Amino acid sequence: MLDYFFNPRGIAVIGASNDPKKLGYEVFKNLKEYQGGKVYPVNVREEEVQGVKAYKSVKEIPGEVDLAIIVVPKKFVKQTLIECGEKGVKGVVIITAGFGETGEEGKREEKELVEIAHKYGMRIIGPNCVGIMNTHANLNATFITVAKKGNVAFISQSGALGAGIVYKTIKEDIGFSKFISVGNMADLDFADLMEYLADTQEDKAIALYIEGIKDGRRFIEVAKKVTKKKPVIALKAGKSESGSRAAASHTGSLAGSWKIYEAAFKQSGVLVANTIDEMLSMARAFTQPLPKGNRVAIMTNAGGPGVLTADEIDKRGLKLANLEEKTIEELRSFLPPMAAVKNPVDMIASARGEDYYRTAKLLLQDPNVDILIAICVVPTFAGMTPTEHAEGIIRAVKEVNNGKPVLALFMAGYVSEKAKELLEKNGIPTYERPEDVAAAAYALVQQAKNVGGGVNG
């Protein structure tokens, strides 16, 4: 089911080019890295494209073609699609623009493309899109740089914004499992793709950038089922009246009032993000298990960030855990007299890796704690190593191993880089701002409610 888009046995790039100024050049160059099957360039004029034997038509290709990427001028798209059908292609990504987004005539032409595709049993992503990626299969069927490998599937209705977010995540060392630019959604839409992604192994969460949904009822129906299996996070553009009008003119889809969308998301268990950063923060949280409740313990080596995080937690309707007396006494037994041993636990700036280990272990073992947020702000000094605090947290998590989620907030900018890398490698999502880690904790709690995790509070 739609797997031929993301793990195809053969790919044709129709409009593959030797001219670096053309999109077909970039798409083919990126796809040459794919190892899951053969990649064939199709170009009516060239014998070879980028050193690979080219074919005049997709029908001339000797091998099997599961997926075709169409990046030819608009006037050739229809005929190309018919040839794909005759060849037995299963999935088609149409990058070419100039269809439904241009008005009534374009919408009519787009409808015709879908009719042709369905006649041959093909499905379409696009038109007017950037393409698709599956980082777990080394598949980059776009004209942009491939995303880093991760476990969030990101579906974007805006190609340019989607590309911008991919570039942002590369810089911030955040990974995607899949990137799908849906364009005009003439055929496959959010609901179809969510349905497919619900059962994949490598996609732990699904993030959506939405401007407008064509079939609201089906979206709700599918989302209700999908959110019971894995989290869906939506960033909806066009909340204001002017934004809504802009969204409608951009993709040619119905934007609809934000109130309607908000109700639909709530009804179907979709988590709502208000910004790009919030969407990414929420989506990244799901390398962690889901919590049993909404009580959060905070440990920190500086007072300020602990208080700021407590404020953000409160804003989200989560609770600061009341630590057991036994936990408080044990913390007091090894932390300095100036340390604050009630939640948030402020171990003060002198805290070493061992203190992080012992504190994290006690907090995770406390039955009143559902989620742990471990904060490290103070840059290393007095002989501390750059990763000792992170190592302490990881050691505690591995030893206690009781299925409670742990999130990290490392705020010392470039000084924290190595520690953050180590935490992420061990599946602990690491953030730089209190509001981001709070968004992540909130997302975990909400998703636990979706799957019926019996969340208290």
Swiss-Prot record:
User: By its UniProt entry, which InterPro entries does this protein fall under?
Assistant: AcCoA-synth-alpha, Acyl-CoA_Synth/Transferase, CoA-bd, Ligase_CoA_dom, NAD(P)-bd_dom_sf, Succ_CoA_lig_flav_dom, Succinyl-CoA_synth-like
Instruction: Report the family membership.
Output: Belongs to the acetate CoA ligase alpha subunit family.
Q: What species is this protein from?
A: Pyrococcus furiosus (strain ATCC 43587 / DSM 3638 / JCM 8422 / Vc1)
Keyword Ion transport belongs to the record: no
The record's subunit annotation is: Heterotetramer of two alpha and two beta subunits.
Q: Which superkingdom is the protein from? A: Archaea
Matches recorded under Gene3D superfamilies: NAD(P)-binding Rossmann-like Domain (3.40.50.720), Succinyl-CoA synthetase domains (3.40.50.261)
Catalysed reactions, semicolon-separated: acetate + ATP + CoA = acetyl-CoA + ADP + phosphate
Residue ranges spanning the membrane: these are none
Entry's EC annotation = 6.2.1.13
Thermal properties: Optimum temperature is above 90 degrees Celsius (at pH 8.0).
SUPFAM superfamilies, alphabetically?
NAD(P)-binding Rossmann-fold domains, Succinyl-CoA synthetase domains
- What protein name does the entry list? Acetate--CoA ligase [ADP-forming] II subunit alpha
Q: Which PANTHER family match?
A: ACETATE--COA LIGASE [ADP-FORMING]
Q: What Pfam families does this protein's entry cite?
A: CoA_binding_2 (PF13380), Ligase_CoA_2 (PF19045), Succ_CoA_lig (PF13607)
pH-dependent activity: Optimum pH is 9.0 (at 80 degrees Celsius).
Q: Which UniProt keywords apply?
A: ATP-binding, Ligase, Nucleotide-binding
